[in-house]
Curated annotation (Swiss-Prot):
GO terms for molecular function: precorrin-8X methylmutase activity. Coiled coil: none annotated. The gene is cobH. It comes from the Bacteria. The keyword Isomerase applies. This is Precorrin-8X methylmutase. Catalyzes the conversion of precorrin-8X to hydrogenobyrinate.
Length: 208
């Protein structure tokens, strides 16, 4: 029989202990410490903590919004599926509109990606929500355009789009001017659905 740890909770405990031993968390505020640990856990790279950028009080803002029942708006199904429902404090709605029937036609009409124009369906849910971008840079660019045009403001933006075209730029644009919305990003090309969902899961409950 192969010798390996079979207890899921023991694996989590050892993983988080290893992260805290190896990662430099000195610059992470208390309200984002668990978020940083879970983002590292999701990608396996302790150095990603060096690329985390955030506005003051972002973690507290996200926790308060979720506790108050805020909707969680996700740019991709993989992000939405990664949110652990049992951790959510108020049976929060997890919304992804990418597969709405009119999105392909809307993308053609507006001359943008489906990931971007799917945010048109977010308008009624945006105010006070937690926005989670874990895939498409165009979705984050489009969100900023919507806010510039007067769309309601979410309570928090978790900006984790990934890739080689627009990912770094969209996140830097958010950090440079968050339109008055608290935010957390990982700078550069790194990001993705697993890290984005991990950030939500960390804010959803005080449980490790």
């Amino acid at each position: 029989m192969i010798d390996y740890i079979r207890d899921g909770q023991a694996i989590y405990r050892q993983s988080f202990a290893t992260i805290r031993a190896e990662a430099n968390l000195a610059g992470i505020p208390a309200d984002l410490e668990k978020l940083a640990v879970r983002v590292i856990h999701a990608c396996g790279m302790v150095d990603v903590v060096d690329d985390l950028r955030f506005s003051p009080g972002a973690g507290a803002a996200g926790r308060a919004a979720l506790a108050a029942g805020a909707a969680i708006l996700c740019d991709a199904r993989m992000v939405a599926e990664g949110v652990t429902r049992s951790r959510l404090p108020a049976a929060n709605r997890v919304i992804c509109t990418l597969n709405e029937a009119d999105v392909p036609a809307l993308a053609t009409e507006l001359g943008n990606t489906r990931s971007a124009v799917a945010l048109e369906h977010w308008r009624e849910h945006l105010e006070g929500s937690v926005v989670v971008i874990g895939n498409a840079p165009t979705a984050l660019f489009y969100l900023l355009e919507m806010l510039d045009a007067g769309a309601p403001k979410p309570a928090l933006i978790l900006g984790f789009p990934v890739g080689f075209v627009g990912a770094a730029e969209s996140k830097e644009m958010l950090a440079a001017d968050s339109r008055g919305v608290p935010y957390v990003i990982v700078r550069g090309r790194r990001g993705g659905s697993a890290m984005a969902a991990a950030a939500v899961n960390a804010l959803a409950t005080e449980r490790e």
